[in-house]
């Protein structure tokens, strides 16, 4: 250090330490990439028709921010007819994803027509839709029949159950009653219907069989950034 001022020596030491630190610790942006990136899974989007019925009377008071009625529970059976959709590069157009919420379990049904890649994609999406299940969750495969008409809807999920409903017509007796922005399902407009019969029974202990219960029919458009689905 002979011939150098104390100030120049201090700056040299500081610069040396700074270079060592730069090469030793990763940049903040790199650390961010490590913790985010694709950790949340593939990007996805699905849109189409939602067909649903539950054990509540018409109208289901859950759709208006209240508890179930006239019983203390609300068990539901529904299906998503995916008219356009993808999970990453996997196309999901024309497939269906059905589900039920019961006393003993929640069960997802993958369309039996799905390829192995599509089935994995639908299972992954199902996991995103149901974020905080309160009961056990199962995933199975089934033939799903979903029909949407001008005066009613119909759903059959394999041998497990289904329903048929007629839309509730308004005062003009021509157009159905519609509820906008309901509190249960993320669909802009929900056509209200009444089931002729809603029945379901599975191997997990869920069972219900009722008549004249609530039904909803509407369009959905969900993706991996949608804040809430139902």
Give a label for each model feature:
Residues 11-21:
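Bacterial N-terminal signal peptides
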Residues 22-33:
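Signal peptide processing junction and immediate N-terminal pro/mature segment
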Residues 32-46:
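N-terminal low-complexity, Pro/Thr/Ser-rich intrinsically disordered segments
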Residues 1-6:
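N-terminal secretory signal peptides that target proteins for export/translocation
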Residues 42-230:
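Beta-strand-enriched cores of mature, soluble protein domains
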């Amino acid at each position: 250090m002979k011939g150098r001022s104390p100030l120049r020596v201090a700056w040299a030491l500081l610069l040396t330490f700074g270079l060592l630190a730069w090469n030793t610790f990763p940049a903040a942006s790199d650390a961010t990439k490590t913790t985010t990136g694709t950790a949340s899974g593939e990007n996805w989007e699905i849109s189409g028709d939602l067909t649903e019925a539950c054990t509540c009377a018409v109208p289901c008071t859950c759709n208006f921010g209240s508890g179930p009625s006239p019983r203390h529970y609300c068990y539901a059976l529904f299906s998503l007819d995916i008219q356009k959709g993808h999970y990453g590069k996997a196309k999901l157009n024309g497939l269906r994803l059905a589900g039920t919420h019961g006393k003993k379990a929640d069960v997802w049904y993958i369309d039996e027509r799905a390829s192995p890649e599509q089935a994995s994609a639908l299972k992954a999406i199902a996991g995103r839709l149901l974020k905080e299940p309160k009961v056990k969750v199962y995933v199975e495969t089934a033939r799903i029949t979903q029909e949407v008409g001008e005066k009613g809807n119909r759903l059959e999920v394999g041998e497990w159950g289904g329903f048929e409903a007629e839309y509730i017509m308004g005062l003009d007796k021509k157009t159905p009653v519609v509820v906008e922005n309901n509190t249960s399902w993320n669909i802009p407009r929900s056509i209200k219907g009444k089931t002729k019969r809603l029945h379901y029974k599975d191997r997990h202990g869920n069972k219900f069989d009722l008549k004249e219960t609530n039904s909803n029919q509407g369009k959905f458009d969900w993706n991996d950034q949608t804040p809430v689905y139902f």
